[in-house]
Structures are given as structure tokens and as C-alpha cells.
């Protein structure tokens, strides 16, 4: 028993040595997360402003209070770690953001369609444009209190209009 205790103590001391693995001075190998790429989820995104995100057949991005609408079913596809593409299943449009922070539906997949997905402390998700920033600040996907798309340049991570809950499609 004593021998095990001494071996455990010696292991702890050696693990804290300057060249031991796990310390900042040790070199790390490249990280690989292939299991997180290519994930596809069908969800409805419910905003903190009480609207479901939808893309209508004309490509207009907006909110709806009707929870059973077919145009609010979204395919959220992971393209890289933390980067997703949002596509409306019924209309086939991708949710995209232009350089001015305006949301629109795009028939083609472009770099404007990529969003950084982050799970916030309150359990909601935020989606920031991967390509566009305004004055160094990320531009977020958001719905205002009337269900309209809020300009990305006027949204921040802490705004409730940018917080979404992914709801399972039943």
C-alpha cells in the first residue's frame, strides 16, 4: 500500500516536470476532429424573440410564430468544426448574409452561407457570419421583435435577438 502511494506521488511530481507532456512548453501534435465535420441535423431554430426562423419559397429570411410550418424546417450541416451551413428543406434556399449584414436566401452554396455556431452560457446558440465583420465585430443572424431579420451590423453576441434554440423536428 505504501509503495503504491509513493509511486503515485512520484508520478505526480514527474508529471509536473518542465518537459512533461501536458505542460505549455511541450509541443502538441495537430488536433483533428473529423467526427465533428459533415454532421447533418434537421431542426427548427426558435429565437428568443419567440419566432421560428424560416426561408419562404421566394428566398426571404424572416420569422414565423407558426411552429408547424414546413418552411421553418432547417437542415443544419457542419462543414468545419464550429462552422455550419443552414438550408431550408422545403424551399432549398441557403441562409446567407451579405457584406452589409442583410440576410437573404441563396439558391447556391457560397461562402456567404457559412456561420460560426456557438453555444452560449444560457444554452442558446448564436450564428455569426464566418466571412463578414463590421468594424472588427462579428455580424450575427438575428430576428427582431416583429420577426423581421435584424441587420447583422447591429447585433452582438449578448443580444437576445441573436439567441436561438434548436428544436427537434417531430
Curated annotation (Swiss-Prot):
Which key words are in the record?
Answer: Growth factor, Secreted, Signal
Can you say where in the cell this protein is located?
A: Secreted
- Name assigned to this protein: Fibroblast growth factor 22
Note the subunit structure. Answer: Interacts with FGFR1 and FGFR2. Interacts with FGFBP1.
Q: Where is the signal peptide?
A: 1-22
Gene Ontology biological process: cell differentiation; fibroblast growth factor receptor signaling pathway; neurogenesis; positive regulation of cell population proliferation; positive regulation of MAPK cascade; regulation of cell migration; regulation of synapse maturation; trans-synaptic signaling
Its GO CC terms? cell surface; cytoplasm; extracellular region; extracellular space; extrinsic component of postsynaptic density membrane; GABA-ergic synapse; glutamatergic synapse; Golgi apparatus
* Alphabetical list of InterPro entries matching this protein: Fibroblast_GF_fam, IL1/FGF
User: To which species is this protein native?
Assistant: Homo sapiens (Human)
